[in-house]
Amino acid sequence: MNSSYHRRVPVVGELGSATSSQLPSTSPSIVIPLGSTEQHGPHLPLDTDTRIATAVARTVTARLHAEDLPIAQEEWLMAPAIAYGASGEHQRFAGTISIGTEALTMLLVEYGRSAACWARRLVFVNGHGGNVGALTRAVGLLRAEGRDAGWCPCTCPGGDPHAGHTETSVLLHLSPADVRTERWRAGNRAPLPVLLPSMRRGGVAAVSETGVLGDPTTATAAEGRRIFAAMVDDCVRRVARWMPQPDGMLT
């Protein structure tokens, strides 16, 4: 596929390209993209959340290397993405692979315990809202155990919930060849608080036959560039401040 997520690109600061012998002397901090594999309507790929989280994490890591920030004095590496999450609300749609909140919580806890044996700090960059329950429990526990972990969201103020204007715009910026514009159409555009009671009973399929919440037909690459830059700026600011809440979210 024509995307930075699928195409292997040599980038300074990628954990996957380091060797074990390089790490003990540096005690790096690591940025871990956390996404999902789930339906994103008829027009976006199943790994949309993972692509966005990976691109944000990669750009944040590069910014931490380049900018004159106190926390940038540490070595920062981007880890390979965790591409499966808690996506049960999308389970009625083909292609969705959800490991659930309990399994994801344990995965993140054991991941953090292992990585903290040699890494100074851990920050998870989350691309899927359904992962928040697992993140808060796992990172909160890691912090209670004395490990310096945190997480930050890939969010956009005022964005629509799922596979609509926001995510489609970002994918038009990151992976334009993989957005099937001939298949997009508006989904349920009601506010998320209005939809949640029905979604709790029957998932996304109960409120949208296409799996879309929002309107992707208004998306543009220019808007995606702006949204993506805002996501990166927000994450860099949170990491630079490094002020985790009790649940581990960086503020």
UniProtKB/Swiss-Prot annotation:
Cofactor field: Fe(2+); Zn(2+)
- Residue sites binding a divalent metal cation 1 per the record: E38, D49, H128
* Family matches, as Pfam families: Creatininase (PF02633)
| Enzyme class, UniProt record, top EC level | hydrolase
Which residues does the annotation say bind a divalent metal cation 2?
H40, D49, E167
- What InterPro entries has UniProt attached to this entry? Creatininase-like_sf (IPR024087), Creatininase/forma_Hydrolase (IPR003785), MftE (IPR023871)
Which keywords has UniProt assigned to this entry? Hydrolase, Iron, Metal-binding, Protease, Zinc
Alphabetical GO biological process terms: proteolysis; riboflavin biosynthetic process
Q: Which domain of life is it from?
A: Bacteria
Keyword Disulfide bond annotated: no
Question: What Enzyme Commission number(s) apply to this enzyme?
Answer: 3.4.14.14
Q: Does the keyword Hydrolase apply?
A: yes
| Catalyzed chemical reaction(s) | [mycofactocin precursor peptide]-C-terminal glycyl-N-{5-[(4-hydroxyphenyl)methyl]-4,4-dimethyl-2-oxopyrrolidin-3-yl}acetamide + H2O = [mycofactocin precursor peptide]-C-terminal glycine + 3-amino-5-[(4-hydroxyphenyl)methyl]-4,4-dimethyl-2-pyrrolidin-2-one
Q: Which residues form a coiled coil?
A: none
| One example GO MF annotation | metal ion binding
Q: What does the record say about how the cofactor binds? A: MftE appears to bind one Fe(2+) and one Zn(2+) ion per subunit. Fe(2+) seems to be catalytically active while Zn(2+) could play an auxiliary role.
State its role.
Answer: Peptidase involved in the biosynthesis of the enzyme cofactor mycofactocin (MFT). Catalyzes cleavage of the MftC-modified MftA peptide to liberate its final two residues, which consist of a cross-linked valine-decarboxylated tyrosine dipeptide (named 3-amino-5-[(4-hydroxyphenyl)methyl]-4,4-dimethyl-2-pyrrolidin-2-one or ADHP).
Spell out the subunit comment.
Homooctamer.
Among NCBIfam families, the record links this protein to: mycofact_creat (TIGR03964)
UniProt similarity note:
Belongs to the creatininase superfamily.
Name the chain's protein: Mycofactocin precursor peptide peptidase
